[in-house]
Curated annotation (Swiss-Prot):
GO MF, one example: FAD binding
EC number of the protein: 1.-.-.-
Species whose genome carries this gene: Penicillium roqueforti (strain FM164)
Name listed for the protein in its UniProt record: FAD-linked oxidoreductase ifgC
UniProt entry tagged with the keyword Ribosomal protein: no
Cofactor(s) named in the record: FAD
Length: 629
């Protein structure tokens, strides 16, 4: 009886302590100046557990400043920093370096021409440590460490992100870029299924688009992927939807074609310890490795198919469908025109008419508009006729459009190119950035099938885009939706905004930005207050944006990114990441945290605290009484 009393009293103390510590830990994550921050010895233990792949991060430009100045290395970094492939491999760099700077004046470590006037290098938004993982076990170790010490955890693959989601100050980064395995399957068999699913490829989290294109071409395949060769295949691109500029018309979104994910979960469970050996000890174990497909963990599979990267777990591998690498004819129609509203609008309407007409014939393409100067714009429309080998046939089909354009514009160009394999169009070599030392910001808006395919749809969209204030260096381009993207709405279920199944074009707007705190702030203000209202006004009742390239200050992100899918996504977020280890800017559940994912905010956090605490208490009661009896 006395033993029972002491056990109950001990349990009460334990429960009280759990509630108290859970409350303390759930408000803000641990910061370097706080006693909770891991000691050097604890960081070294993590390093050993990960086979010495943990590194202490500094911005790549740090070698150019006094405390660690190395002139030769500085020159090398300045030269290599323009190589997108090199940046992808560097955990202390981002592709869009406007997000490397912090929020306070001077909290940056600029490189190149932006160094003028800067005498010190500051950390900015570059995480303090990076787990440069080589295996799923390394990912598990990093997850366990971040959970145990209540650290901000960031997932980075190649650093491509226009909203700053690949970095955060005072964080531990998991750098997935070394997970480079690629395996092709002639007829893939998924876990839990008796049937097979045809040709597919399994891709590690660090594989870049250009590398996958090259390997796929060697095997006679193409994949639904993006245009940039250094974007990671499996990370935010795939989990955010994955749009191919012209192949989505034929094969749907990339996320429509994913068959299975391998995931290290964010939740770290409290295991039931052995009643004899471990009574009195409750230890956290590593994040579980799970498979998610239509049969195994189907709710997680649904969430990962459009719910956004770095949110529900750390994806370490994905298996996707591949398609035959067919021949094609690429036909390019171009003009150089004035920014005069009437002339510009008429040219755009002609381009959109070509897109409208050829999309109905299952021919996809992309319009790219580059602002050359204050008075000059260059526009090129590239259409892809799949399974075609005769340029004369394509030229004949394009001739009426060329003649229509010549009635509007003086400077018109046209050419057609035969591609023995469609993969020849894909860029497989990393981009080399220009010499302007600028980053970029941008956003997107989708155009509905109802508007675009109306009789006056092309003219209406063109007139709306012509209203957009631009400056030299700005870029506007389309991504072709419709076709199989729309048909897939009846064939499969993803967590994408349902309105994607009624979208025919995605308008992308990108602006070069001086990578300073002031430059970023001014550009963000213009993007949110001027450009996005004008873009949304083109199709105001549709109001759909692409989360992978969205306004970093989007206030209504739940609705414009996910719509009616959001409620279920939030429910699954609380199931698979109950304590909010993975918070992505403008991602599912991020409204419960501050802008950097450091501190919980608002009433919902208290509700989560109660749910989490009760769940932990229930498990503690179960384990304790098992030991007592």
């Amino acid at each position: 009886m006395m033993f029972h009393f002491l056990g109950t009293a001990g349990l009460g103390i334990a429960l009280s302590w759990l509630v108290f510590t859970h409350f303390l830990q759930s408000s803000c994550r641990c910061q370097p100046w706080e006693p909770c921050w891991p000691s050097d010895e604890q960081w070294e233990l993590l390093n050993r557990s990960m086979e010495f792949t943990l590194v202490r991060l500094q911005p790549i430009a740090s070698v150019c400043y006094n405390h660690s100045l190395d002139h030769t290395l500085c020159e090398d970094v300045m030269r290599m920093s323009r190589d997108s492939g090199w940046r992808a491999s560097q955990p202390g760099a981002l592709q869009d370096w406007v997000w490397e700077s912090g929020q306070s004046p001077g909290d940056a470590c600029p490189l190149g021409s932006q160094m003028n006037g800067h005498t010190q290098c500051h950390q900015g938004r570059i995480p303090l440590y990076s787990a440069m993982v080589n295996s799923t076990k390394h990912v598990q170790e990093a997850v366990m460490f971040a959970k145990r010490h209540d650290l901000r955890l960031i997932i980075r693959n190649t650093g491509h992100d226009l909203a700053g989601r690949s970095s955060s100050p005072n964080a531990l980064q998991i750098h997935t870029h070394r997970l480079q395995d690629i395996k092709f399957h002639d007829n893939v068999q998924l876990h839990g299924f008796e049937k097979s699913f045809g040709p597919a490829v399994s891709v590690g989290a660090g594989v870049m688009m250009g590398d996958l294109y090259a390997r796929s071409a060697q095997n006679g395949y193409i994949v639904v992927g993006g245009d940039c060769p250094t974007v990671g295949v499996v990370g935010g691109f795939l989990q955010g939807g994955g749009i191919s500029d012209f192949l989505s018309l034929h094969h749907g979104l990339a996320v429509d074609n994913v068959l299975e994910f391998e995931v290290v979960t964010a939740s770290v469970s409290l295991p039931e310890p052995d009643a004899i050996q471990y009574c009195g000890f409750l230890t956290l174990r590593q994040g579980d490795i799970v498979l998610a497909n239509a049969i195994r963990n189907p709710d997680l599979f649904w969430a990962l198919r459009g719910g956004g990267g770095g949110t529900f777990g750390i994806v370490t591998r994905a298996t996707m469908r591949v398609f035959p690498d067919v021949p094609a004819i690429a036909a390019e129609l171009g003009v150089q025109t004035s920014q005069s509203h009437g002339e510009y609008s008429r040219s755009l309407a002609a381009f959109f008419t070509v897109l409208q007409s050829l999309n109905r014939e299952n021919v996809g393409g992309q319009l790219i508009i580059t602002v050359i100067s204050e008075h000059s714009i260059e526009a090129k429309l590239k259409m892809f006729f799949l399974n075609q080998t005769n340029t004369a046939d394509v030229d004949q089909r394009m001739q009426p459009f060329v003649e229509d354009m010549r009635r509007i514009e003086t400077h018109v160009t046209y050419e057609s190119t035969s591609l023995p394999k469609l993969s020849m169009n894909y860029r497989q070599v990393p981009d080399i950035h220009t010499d302007n030392d600028y980053g970029v910001l941008g956003s997107t808006v989708a155009i509905s099938n109802d508007l675009f395919n109306a009789s006056k749809g092309p003219a209406y969209v063109a007139d709306g885009l012509a209203q957009l204030p631009t400056r030299p260096g700005d870029l506007l381009f389309t991504s072709n939706l419709g076709g199989q993207v729309m048909r897939n709405g009846d064939l499969m279920e993803t967590s994408m905004h349902p309105a994607w199944r009624n979208a025919t074009q995605l308008i992308n707007f990108v602006r070069p930005v001086e990578p300073t705190i002031e430059g970023k702030a001014g550009a963000l203000q213009n993007l949110t207050n001027i450009h996005m209202p004008l873009l949304y006004a083109i199709d105001p009742r549709f109001r759909l944006s692409y989360r992978n390239v969205g306004d970093p200050n989007e206030k209504d992100f739940q609705q414009v990114y996910w719509g009616q899918s959001y409620a279920r996504l939030l429910q699954l977020k609380r199931r698979w990441d109950r304590e909010g280890l993975l918070i992505s800017k403008l991602g599912v559940g991020s409204e419960e945290w501050d802008s950097e994912g450091m501190c919980r905010t608002g009433r919902r956090s208290l509700e989560n605290l109660a749910i989490d605490t009760l769940s932990s208490l229930a498990h503690l009661i179960h384990v304790t009484y098992r030991c007592i009896w």
